[in-house]
């Protein structure tokens, strides 16, 4: 029996002025939304974690779940979760600010119930 093709969520591209392109998924599962809600409410954080720790974890969580690829200054796009997360952790303050703005913009448009940090 032939397999049905898997549903692929639509993706949206966001370009910066330096040849960079961030591609974000257009869908979030109910389980992902619930897990994000627990992080935002502090339920899935380590004991003693600060508000800033929670904010950073929420940002990283959305980044992990939504980013399909990230092209930086026209270089080969990063696609694996490991590469993407590693690059995020070495991102400059300006790059992080740009990423946060894109995640907020994307969530506002596609997931109004998900409030990005």
Model-assigned labels for residue ranges:
Residues 9-19:
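Short acidic-hydrophobic surface loop/beta-edge motif
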Residues 20, 25-117:
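Short, surface-exposed, charged amphipathic helix/loop patches that serve as local interaction elements
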